[in-house]
């Protein structure tokens, strides 16, 4: 819990602070988050460890509460800010995305996190992760990254090898989106040929977890910001030729059966043997199956991790996404 370990650290940066914590009378901090299941258990364990060690030593006691889903958390925060009937009071710390932080800060409800970290400490993080917490009209840091990720390409290595041995396909061909599309077509035709008595029963090769990421990052790789925001105004730059290029490497292979999306996530489609590879969040690797389960039985598989494919001739750009944590403005003792 990075932000929790920073609790009290601000005192080292601002020694003239009048706040003095008392281990015998600890200050209580409330944290809202959206974790559930194993993630919630791990987060609760980190809080318990903090309370029993550094928190106990300094006089800080943290209580964590899940609000359910990301949407539930955003609504709880929005209701608290608006003072809606039945709403809870704002927590001291909450997990959030940049859009929610921006809305809350417009109401003047957030504390500046800049004093919590030295410039050297901030420099240890990916710059774009930190910069997301700053807003164009303010030099204060309002969102600190704690759960960021990018995208990767994951492949069922076991079944890929069978396909590669039979057709001469190479992993190098998967470095570009056009190469993935061509490989997916070849895979469909190859699997279709395995059952000559059944026409058009080829299998899909590839899937994409986030269509929005595909279009936004694809345009960026071609040098265009699909959503261009300047002075608070949004301009959609939908260059017809570039959009068509993205369309031809997304919609067309989906229609032809070369790409597919069946389950909620593409890792689900790997598990059922419906696809061989996909592009998704780094966090999705936790759910990549070690077995494929079909009507014909169950078989063990291995995996390959690669960088996501880039449009041929395009700039190597990947998405950065995920949540951070924000601290609400209250009093010196709770913000300390």
Question: Whereabouts are the PLM-identified features?
Answer:
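Extracytoplasmic/periplasmic substrate-recognition and gating elements
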Residues: 82, 256, 294-336
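Hinge/lid segment of periplasmic solute-binding proteins
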Residues: 15-17, 74, 96-152, 298-309, ...
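Paired acidic/hydrophobic, glycine-rich loop segments that form the ligand-binding mouth/hinge
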Residues: 92-95, 276-281
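Extracytoplasmic/periplasmic solute-binding protein
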Residues: 136-146, 151, 178-235
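A ligand-binding cleft/hinge motif common to bilobed small-molecule-binding domains
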Residues: 101-105, 282-299
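Conserved N-terminal structural module of periplasmic/extracytoplasmic solute-binding proteins
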Residues: 1-106, 121-122, 312
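Short, solvent-exposed loop/beta-turn-alpha elements that line the ligand-binding surface or hinge
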Residues: 114-126, 169-173, 198-206, 224-245, ...
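Glycine-centered hinge/linker elements that transmit conformational signals in sensory
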Residues: 181-188, 229-263, 308
